[in-house]
UniProtKB/Swiss-Prot annotation:
Protein name (database record): S-(+)-linalool synthase, chloroplastic
Upregulation: By jasmonate.
Single GO MF annotation: S-linalool synthase activity
Positions bound to (2E)-geranyl diphosphate: 309, 346, 350, 487, 490
Length: 595
């Protein structure tokens, strides 16, 4: 296992350093750009949202200067060797705990606690055999129904994450009074309250005990911060601001490590391995970012479509956070290119094309024929050539690695995205106001989430040839949930992020039109309830060991559902604007995970 870990890291780093860039057959030309102001019939809906904040999305000079800071091959070799040695140390510790567990009952609790630390540090996959052995179902069941709040809630979380059926009401009922309220003697159990707060976000719907758990733990942790010692107070504050289940684990891991380093009893090997792991992952992501940056600069679309968003770092952050693991480096790079085209095509529809041009653009995509785009403006032809090349390259890569060529399914996914954008264009040009539910259904498609995840599904080697058409036509909940969460969050932040001319709609705006007696705050609260409902549905999909009830014939690999969950976790970060129209949490994520 250890050798596999390091060969995965080293081979991924070498591939990023040496792999040739997958460039389009012809780069876009900046000399033939088309100004949206000169295009008759064009409707500018997002004219103020054409350039990102430099504080969050550094420009080319900043990114170029950063590339000179990358370590040498010798530095990489030293990092990998240290990671290998520390992994051996932690593995030896886990084996020692296993032997102790065989002798004493308390050893089981120690092993479960270690598994929790490894998961919070995003390192459990290096020790999968040991983790599986420690996750004894009988022990977890015993702890979940015991009388210790920390043990019970931790066991509940681990069991639910593993797909086991476990009742929140049964587990938490032991800690409530006759009225179903949590007993007051748990108000001072800080670690128990933190664990209770963790599981309160794992609601799969109609779990009243978890709603009460969230209210009870939040209220008492907030009041406890004032008297806790500083290190624990910071950890509690961070846990409340960024709840474990709905936050990116990579980000939480850094804060968990900082907390572990303040404890009187420490596991030095595990802490040092976490630091080495952070360094290697950051290095790998920096190299991936450099390759994507080179591809984007050589492509030339930023010069040809100057009003379009030029946010290479933002596009990469989506994939960096959703798809984890050194072995999936190439997957992150190629899917970042797909994400970039979603943004560029959105801007072409919003800012550049007339309805007639966009209709022809959509038809060319349906035909998947470059010649069909000959009559289009230069920027559209260049965009089509680029996305056509990248998509075909991905299909060829999937065929080489997995023996299936998914190009027909990928073409259909692209056509679905363009049809969704075309629907919005028709609404706008005709002055038509869709109802909120119709808007949201189309918004799932135009979010780009289904398109990206269709590509991901095939790149992971999952053969859905029997039902891929159904996957595209009837988007499964594991994809529609993060897509709806993204669309609704985006709409909540659109007033801060965009200055729109005309009504291309937001769910909140349309809902207010349908309910004229509501105040804006009530409509926003309705949207937040919808987001919470989508999280509950996504939890059901991710925590169920059986196929989805909505699509019983379809099961997805664990890496796929984890990516969907991570995408949902990142939405609030990507659209969490503060009062000054900044994204401070995203800035913190990027600084911590990439630079």
């Amino acid at each position: 296992m250890v050798c596999h870990v390091f060969s995965s890291f080293s081979s991924s780093l070498i591939r990023v350093l040496e792999a040739p860039l997958l460039l389009p057959a012809a780069s876009a030309s900046s000399s033939s750009s088309s100004s949206p102001a000169s295009r008759s019939g064009g409707r500018r809906r997002r004219a103020a949202h054409v350039r990102p904040s430099p504080a969050i999305y550094p420009g080319r000079q900043e990114l170029a200067s950063h590339s000179s800071m990358l370590p040498t091959d010798f530095d990489i070799k030293v990092l990998i060797e240290r990671h290998e040695a520390l992994t051996d140390d932690v593995q030896e510790m886990l084996q020692h705990q296993r032997r102790r567990h065989q002798k004493t009952a308390s050893g089981g609790r120690e092993r479960i606690a270690t598994v929790d630390h490894l998961r919070r540090l995003c390192m459990d996959h290096y020790f999968q055999d040991e983790v599986d052995d420690a996750m004894d179902a009988c022990l977890l069941e015993e702890l979940a129904h015991g009388g210790d709040l920390l043990d019970a809630t931790l066991a509940f979380r681990l069991m639910r994450e593993a797909g086991h059926h476990v009742s929140a009401d049964e587990v938490l009922g032991r800690f409530t009074d006759d009225n179903g309220e949590f007993r007051l003697d748990y108000r001072k159990d800080i670690r128990g309250l933190l664990s209770l707060q963790d599981i309160s976000h794992m609601n799969i719907g109609q779990e009243a005990s978890l709603c009460k758990a969230k209210e009870f733990s939040t209220r008492n942790l907030e009041s406890a911060i004032n008297y806790l010692e500083p290190n624990l107070a910071r950890y509690v504050r961070q846990s409340l601001d960024h709840p474990y289940h709905v936050s990116l684990n990579q980000y939480k891991a850094r804060h968990h490590l900082s907390y572990l380093q303040t404890l009187p009893i420490r596991c030095t090997a595990m802490e040092e391995l976490a630091l080495a792991d952070f360094q290697l992952n950051k290095l790998l992501h920096q190299m991936e970012m450099q390759e994507i940056k080179r591809w984007w600069m050589d492509l030339g679309l930023a010069q040809e479509i100057p009003v379009a968003r030029d946010q290479v770092q933002k596009w990469f952050v989506w994939m960096m956070t959703a798809i984890q693991g050194a072995s999936l480096s190439r997957c992150r790079i190629e899917l970042t290119k797909i994400v970039s085209f979603v943004y560029i095509v959105d801007d072409i529809f919003d800012l550049v094309g007339t309805r007639e041009e966009l209709s022809c653009f959509t038809q060319a995509i349906r035909m998947w024929d470059l010649a069909a785009a000959d009559s289009l403006p230069s920027c559209m032809r260049s965009c089509f050539r680029a996305l056509h090349t990248v998509t075909n390259d991905i299909a060829d890569m999937v065929e080489r690695e997995h023996g299936v060529n998914p190009i027909n399914h990928l073409k259909k996914a692209w056509a679905m995205l363009f049809d969704g954008f075309m629907t919005e264009t028709k609404w706008l040009s005709a002055g038509q106001v869709p109802d909120s539910e119709e808007y949201l259904r189309n918004g799932v498609v135009t979010s780009g989430v289904p398109l990206v995840f269709v590509h991901l599904l095939f790149m992971l080697g999952h053969d859905v040839s029997q039902n891929a058409a159904e996957f595209v036509d009837h988007i499964p909940p594991v994809i529609s949930c993060p897509a709806k969460i993204l669309r609704l969050w985006d709409d909540l932040g659109s007033a801060k992020d965009e200055a729109q001319e005309g009504l291309d709609g937001s769910y909140k705006e349309l809902y207010l039109k349908e309910n004229p007696g509501l105040a804006a705050g009530e409509a926003e609260e309705h949207v937040r309830r919808l987001i919470a409902g989508e999280w509950e549905e996504l939890n059901r999909e991710c925590f169920s060991a059986s196929p989805s009830r909505s699509s019983p014939a379809t099961t997805f690999p664990a890496g796929f559902t984890q990516a969907a969950l991570n995408a949902a976790r990142m939405v609030g970060v990507m659209y969490g604007y503060d009062g000054e129209r900044r994204l401070p949490v995203l800035d913190d994520y990027v600084r911590m995970l990439l630079f």
